[in-house]
Amino acid sequence: MLYAGKSPDGSHLLKSARYLLKELPVRIAHRIKSIRNLPFIMGCNPTLLQVHELYIRAFQKLSEFPPIKNSEVEGQYCRLLQQLLDDHKDVVTLLAEGFRESRRHVKDEAVIRQFLDKTLTSRLGMRMLATHHLALHEDRPDFVGIICTRLSPKKIIEKWVDFARRLCEHKYGNAPRVRISGHVAARFPYIPMPLDYILPELLKNAMRATMESHLDTPYNVPDIVVTIANNDVDFIIRISDRGGGIPHKHLDKVMDYHFTTVESSTQELPNNTILGNMVDMVNSGQSNPMHGFGFGLPTSHAYSEYLGGSLVVQSLQGIGTDIYLRLRHIDGKEESFRI
């Protein structure tokens, strides 16, 4: 993606569109098959059936699209892609609701994890490809499609710190300060989109843990420290909080979908109105409330592994938690990942 570049005659757009025309129906067909292979009781869930119908309609529209022979047809294809992106924007929420409604009927946690890991990462890949093609029509400084050629980890962290602090202040009346250290001047080519999901999830978790472990002193809470480390192979973002750590009995469950320390009666849905409006303020549409749905951390973990990296949780019970997000560079110097 990074080295495809742009051609003056627009042939790069036709080439990209033709690739998507062949590739996207195949990927969507795999997702339809995986839904149909779910245990019968889950496949009958109305919310999951809604996702199934969305994928079937997308497959039909994409597979019936005519060959892309000129820029006019490519423009029509772009409009279809944008329509499908809009139609599918709530798929993660629907999956979360559908599995929460039906998971009690399935004893094997591995079935749920394997399905959601594959479905969510496949969805990320398809959205990245489609959004990249649409972005190739734009002329933004330091961008080739969705790839930022000079991404600053510090700046993207600061953006999501501001977002997470506003959420936290709304819920708790205050929010921890965040200090950023390490290789703060680092810049390199990378795709902001997955970071725009992962970082707010990790920051919200750290802020919630900090505030809830200091309920007696909500206006005197320890800082969260974010450290950036950059090298030739990858870059690491460590988020360290003093929120008391994760209890031993929960540590092996934090990567399970729907695991949450919040009681079910108080669980908040991702489309919560007030918090949803805050999400809209930063044009996200991807991030959910401070807690209670149990999807953020396992999804972030799946995304990081899909991108050739890792997400590791280190808990010091009684002190706090360190989370290490490690992602491979995409500059072509070392082995990276395939979208």
Where do the protein language model's features map onto the residues?
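Signal-transmission coiled-coils
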Residues: 1-177, 188, 192-196
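ATP-lid-like helix-loop hinge signature
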Residues: 174, 187, 191, 204-242, ...
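Glycine-rich nucleotide-binding loop
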Residues: 234, 245, 294, 317-324, ...
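Glycine-rich acidic phosphate-binding loop
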Residues: 240-245, 259, 329
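Short adenine-binding "F-helix/F-box" segment of the Bergerat
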Residues: 248-255, 266-267
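A short beta-strand-to-loop micro-motif at the C-terminal edge of the catalytic HATPase_c
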Residues: 280-292, 314-320, 328
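Short alpha-helical Gxxx[C/S/T] motif in the catalytic ATP-binding
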Residues: 296, 300
